[in-house]
């Protein structure tokens, strides 16, 4: 880390890009008029989980900003009382940006409820201009991680059109 707290961690080829976990209990105040999880609350939790993964990957949250949330989708309604486990992993790296895939699953039954992709950008604390993060991806550890990386690349390709 430099004097501004900016991340300069470089991952070796054999280092796995870790999956980070956060949890939320769906309470009454998290519900919409259908008595299921309000989409805006779910989006906030998704971005929060992505930011946790981003900060952990960079070993600091300084200089990391959310650029956008993409392809957030619900596979089924989330009911009050559900224990949601958010699993987040860096799946794409550019020079100053990187993407984090986040999945929200039922902590007790492992049922997938929500997934989405978040793009983060690293910036200089003083100038607020983009700054390289120096993160690199290792080889995927399993088929699921490979599929997540391919989804990120497809999303990038779609956005370039």
Regions from the PLM with identified roles:
Residues 16, 79-80, 91-161:
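HotDog/MaoC-like acyl-thioester-processing domains
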Residues 16-28:
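Short amphipathic
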Residues 26-28, 74, 120-122:
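Hydrophobic residues in beta-strands and at strand termini
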Residues 30-45:
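A conserved, well-ordered hydrophobic junction motif at loop->secondary-structure transitions
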Residues 37, 51-87, 91-98, 111-117:
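Hydrophobic beta-strand-centered segment that forms part of the acyl-chain substrate-binding groove
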Residues 44-48, 52:
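Short, residue-level hotspots on alpha-helical faces of the histone-fold
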